[in-house]
Amino acid sequence: MAIIEPTAALIEPTANKKVIVGMSGGVDSSVSAYLLLKQGYQVEGLFMKNWEEDDTDEYCAAADDLKDAQAVCDKLGIKLHTVNFASEYWDNVFEYFLAEYKAGRTPNPDIICNKEIKFKAFLEFADDILDADYIAMGHYVRRSDDSGQSQMLRGIDGNKDQSYFLYTLSHEQVSRSLFPVGELEKSEVREIAKEMGLITHDKKDSTGICFIGERKFTDFLSTFLPAQPGNIETAEGEVIGTHQGLMYHTLGQRKGLGIGGMKNSNDDPWYVVDKEMDRNVLVVGQGGNHPRLMSTGFYADQLHWVDRIGPDNGAKITVKTRYRQRDVACSLHYDGEDRVKVLFDEPVAAVTPGQSAVFYDAEVCLGGGIIDSLIRE
């Protein structure tokens, strides 16, 4: 079977341009390195270790990932460098993660990791130590320079598009980055890897948060944050159970509540519909469209726009308030320098403070911010 080629929308290759590829030991970065080599770039790999596990830790499996990354680089005939960003990760990603959970919010550490590690610390290391012209990652997004300024577009594979996780990039960072697999479907990426005999061709995609791995989330979090048990109440104020800590729950959560089979309730499942931090109460309601779970909009802060300007006030655009959510039509209204009010065209369920809201104009990722509070009216 013939090797599948990426489309011509990729950046024009130049033989004397050096690209440092973030080699994770997975299939996406493996194929990214192969495609860039095929396009004529000078390619070298860089493996990042971002978490210090002890000798008995089986969760992050950094040693296994490094072994796979080295095998791929050997197969492709390219050099592999290694770097330890564990200190930067702890200071800039993990401590933020803990602080947000302590405040009862639900953060997304992958977004902060991309901002602080993969496209900051990694880019600085590639520049200062490895003399890179570009960096490349195995993310499913695309880059376009048609407007005269680098823009980030959704990946071709809608199920794998990762623009949601990369909204904190600036157009300057996008202009220094290449995303070869963003032009392909995931199945095509695996096909290329298999055709080229890369050891990662059938390697399972990584899921979850790297520093937690296969451990139970509650067990991991309890080692860093003390549990604060409290009551579970219905939206009407009836106490129907207890929780071990608000940090273990998120809006829209259905499983793990331990409150099935309640008297005088219907057969609809129970959902987390609110977290009352001042009373340490977890509020639940029945049905995925419970009124307390719905919102007509939200306020967001910590804004970042890829073009450093942002859309016009009152712009009619779309937003995702969580990964793999369908686009939601909305209008955006500025509320000060670093805050926006976003109004949905139709009510949306389970919008969660602490999560990122990412805005789009058709295929273009405009940027986003952190959801601060909800509008229910």
UniProtKB/Swiss-Prot annotation:
Please report the name of this protein according to its UniProt entry: tRNA-specific 2-thiouridylase MnmA
Question: What residues does ATP bind to?
Answer: 22-29, 48, 138
Q: What is the lineage of its organism?
A: Bacteria, Pseudomonadati, Pseudomonadota, Gammaproteobacteria, Alteromonadales
The cysteines covalently paired via disulfide bonds are 113-210
UniProt keyword ATP-binding present: yes
Gene that encodes it: mnmA
Q: Which reaction equations make up its catalytic activity? A: S-sulfanyl-L-cysteinyl-[protein] + uridine(34) in tRNA + AH2 + ATP = 2-thiouridine(34) in tRNA + L-cysteinyl-[protein] + A + AMP + diphosphate + H(+)
Name the PANTHER family on file: MITOCHONDRIAL TRNA-SPECIFIC 2-THIOURIDYLASE 1, TRNA 5-METHYLAMINOMETHYL-2-THIOURIDYLATE -METHYLTRANSFERASE
Note the site residues: Interaction with tRNA: 139, 355
Query: Which protein family is named in the record?
Result: Belongs to the MnmA/TRMU family.
GO molecular function list = ATP binding; tRNA binding; tRNA-uridine 2-sulfurtransferase activity
- Could you tell me which residues belong to the region Interaction with target base in tRNA? 108-110
- NCBIfam families, from UniProt? PRK00143.1, trmU
Q: What job does the chain carry out?
A: Catalyzes the 2-thiolation of uridine at the wobble position (U34) of tRNA, leading to the formation of s(2)U34.
Please tell me the species this chain comes from: Shewanella woodyi (strain ATCC 51908 / MS32)
Listed under GO biological process in this entry are: tRNA wobble position uridine thiolation
Its subcellular locations are: Cytoplasm
